[in-house]
Structure formats: structure tokens, C-alpha cells
């Protein structure tokens, strides 16, 4: 089994870290204290470079997401709004971001935000049981709601787009993952993934080109892998639970991340970071580490690509971001 080794630990907040996202060398983080902090991640250098205006939101920052290949950031808050931030062009090359827009529409806390691969759709989800899809242009200044999806029966915890297709997955307190697709400008639910026996906190798509698989993490302490099998005559998609990953977690699984390297990482209430590898069609534990944030729960995990190296980042209730390397056993 490989080892998981701590590279760097950054104490960013006094309260819990809910979410972060990485793009173009910058890790954006969101916390209960309403602040969004940006960390420059380069080689072995991890530096806090900006703290965004905390007056933009009245409550916790629950989710942050970079628009692909840009310096535009979306942040969803418990105050039911979404803020959009853009990098300010400065002569002295300092990194600063300005508030570009506030998006309103949800009736309750926004739990998740996610950009489509082309950057023209922004999906948001909420405690109000709905998923909203917003359309924007290249500037990212104006947002039009083109669809409100209300088929979940409970709080929607998380949204994620397929890495190359206009396919959206939403995870919910109703124990399901729903798959959404655009048919002639009409977004429809094309599949309901049933199997988890508790809240589904998050999901992530396989990054392999041309492949349609999804992993999900739940209150039932399991991580599952789902596979798309095809469409039926009514254009509904058939997804099957291809695997339940080895039993590592003893409590809720809050976040999962499927890396470009094919590995799946999971974290949760038990403080364990687990990494799984598929070998000849069977999933095995590649590495695991307990107490990654001491006695605190872990809310988020991400794969980071740095100059040809792949590392992991985790964020917990302790307000700390930890960066980890994976070392294969000799």
C-alpha cells in the first residue's frame, strides 16, 4: 500500500473550511466565517495572496468554483446568493479580485456551484431542493436562469459537470444522485441513481475521455461507482452501480474526487483520507491515512496537478488546508 505524506499545512481560518477549488496555480477556499481566501500553490511554495471582501456575503461560504481556464470565481453562500469575482488587472502584478456580480434566485442556502466544461453554464443547488442552470457570456458579468430543476425531494448538496459533455450530476439529502441533460434547450432528468442508504454529499465524474462513470459519497459511509450503460427508447439513461469501494470509512463520506490519474479520493466525518485504485476491473485501497486533521472532520478533497506532479489537498473543520503527496511502496 502506498503512503500519504504531509507536504504542507496551512492554518487559514478559525472556523471550518467548507470548500475549495484549484485552477492555474491558485487554490480558492471558502469558510464559515464568510471569507474567501486565495492561496498560490507553486512547487513547494504555498502562499496566501488575497482575501476577498467579506461583506459580499452575510453568511458562510459553502462552495467555490473557478470557471475553466479563466480567473473568474463563483462562490455560493448560506445567504442564498452566489457571488462572481474577477481578477483585477494591476500594473504591479499583485493578485487582486473584484466583485463582478451577485446572483439571486434561490430561496434558501446555496450548497453547491459548478461550471460546465466550456464555462458558459453555471449550475447552483440549494436547500430549497432545486438546481438552477444559469447561462452567461465570455465576460461573465450577466447571468440568465435558463432552467430550474425541482425533481429532488430534499436539500440538494452538490452539483458537478461531466468534464467534456453538457451532463450534470446533482447529489441530495433524498439519498439519490440525479443526472441532467439538455434536450433542445430544455434540461431534463435522464437518470436517478438509487442505492445509497443516506444523504449523498458529493459526486465526481471519471476524467477518462469518452467514459461516463461517476463516483459518489454518502452518509451511509460508502463510496460507489456508477456506469452509464446506454439510452432507452424514451431517451432515459441507464446507470448501474458498478462497484461499492472497499469499506474504509466508518462515518459519513462528505467529499469524493476522481483524479486524472484514475484514482479516487474520499474524505469524511471520521477524519480519514482514502485513495482507491482500479486494478483489472476491481477497486482496491491504494492508500489511506487516519487523523489527517487531528480529531476534526474533513469536508473537502481535491487532486492538484503541479508541474507534472499530482498531490492531494484536504480541508477540515479545523480551518486548515493540508497538502499531501502519495508515495508508492518500494
UniProtKB/Swiss-Prot annotation:
Keyword Repeat: yes
Lipid metabolism listed as a keyword: no
Subcellular localization: Cytoplasm; Nucleus
Biological process (GO), any one: iron-sulfur cluster assembly
Gene Ontology terms: cellular component: cytosolic [4Fe-4S] assembly targeting complex; nucleus
InterPro entries for the chain: CIAO1/Cia1 (IPR028608), G-protein_beta_WD-40_rep (IPR020472), WD40/YVTN_repeat-like_dom_sf (IPR015943), WD40_repeat_dom_sf (IPR036322), WD40_rpt (IPR001680)
Keywords: Cytoplasm, Nucleus, Repeat, WD repeat
Recorded superkingdom: Eukaryota
Quaternary organization: Interacts with NAR1.
Family affiliation: Belongs to the WD repeat CIA1 family.
PANTHER family from the UniProt entry: CYTOSOLIC IRON-SULFUR PROTEIN ASSEMBLY PROTEIN CIAO1-RELATED, WD40 PROTEIN CIAO1
Name used for this protein in its record: Probable cytosolic iron-sulfur protein assembly protein 1
Amino acid at each position: 500500500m502506498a503512503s500519504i505524506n504531509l507536504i504542507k499545512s496551512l492554518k487559514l481560518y478559525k472556523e471550518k473550511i467548507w470548500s475549495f477549488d484549484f485552477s492555474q496555480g491558485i487554490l480558492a477556499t471558502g469558510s464559515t466565517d464568510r471569507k474567501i481566501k486565495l492561496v498560490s500553490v507553486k512547487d513547494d511554495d504555498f502562499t496566501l495572496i488575497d482575501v476577498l471582501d467579506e461583506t459580499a456575503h452575510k453568511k458562510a461560504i459553502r462552495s467555490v468554483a473557478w470557471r475553466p481556464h479563466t480567473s473568474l470565481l463563483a462562490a455560493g453562500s448560506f445567504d442564498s446568493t452566489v457571488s462572481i469575482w474577477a481578477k483585477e488587472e494591476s500594473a504591479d502584478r499583485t493578485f487582486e479580485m473584484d466583485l463582478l456580480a451577485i446572483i439571486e434566485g434561490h430561496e434558501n442556502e446555496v450548497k453547491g456551484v459548478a461550471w460546465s466544461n466550456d464555462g458558459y453554464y453555471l449550475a447552483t443547488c440549494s436547500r430549497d431542493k432545486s438546481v438552477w442552470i444559469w447561462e452567461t457570456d465570455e465576460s461573465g458579468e450577466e447571468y440568465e436562469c435558463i432552467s430550474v430543476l425541482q425533481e429532488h425531494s430534499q436539500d440538494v448538496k452538490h452539483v458537478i459537470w461531466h468534464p467534456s459533455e453538457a451532463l450534470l450530476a446533482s447529489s441530495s439529502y433524498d439519498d439519490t444522485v440525479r443526472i441532467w441533460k439538455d434536450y433542445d434547450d430544455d434540461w431534463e432528468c435522464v437518470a436517478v441513481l438509487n442505492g445509497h442508504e443516506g444523504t449523498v454529499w458529493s459526486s465526481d465524474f471519471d476524467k477518462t475521455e469518452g467514459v461516463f462513470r461517476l463516483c459518489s459519497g454518502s452518509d451511509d459511509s460508502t463510496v460507489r461507482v456508477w456506469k452509464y450503460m446506454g439510452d432507452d427508447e424514451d431517451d432515459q439513461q441507464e446507470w448501474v452501480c458498478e462497484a461499492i469501494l472497499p469499506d474504509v470509512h466508518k462515518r459519513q463520506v462528505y467529499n469524493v474526487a476522481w483524479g486524472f490519474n484514475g484514482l479516487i479520493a474520499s474524505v469524511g466525518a471520521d477524519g480519514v483520507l482514502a485513495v482507491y485504485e482500479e486494478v483489472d476491473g476491481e477497486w482496491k485501497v491504494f492508500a489511506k491515512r487516519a487523523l489527517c486533521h487531528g480529531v476534526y472532520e474533513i469536508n473537502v478533497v481535491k487532486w492538484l496537478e503541479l508541474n507534472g506532479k499530482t498531490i492531494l489537498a484536504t480541508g477540515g473543520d479545523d480551518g486548515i488546508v493540508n497538502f499531501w503527496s502519495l508515495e508508492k511502496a518500494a
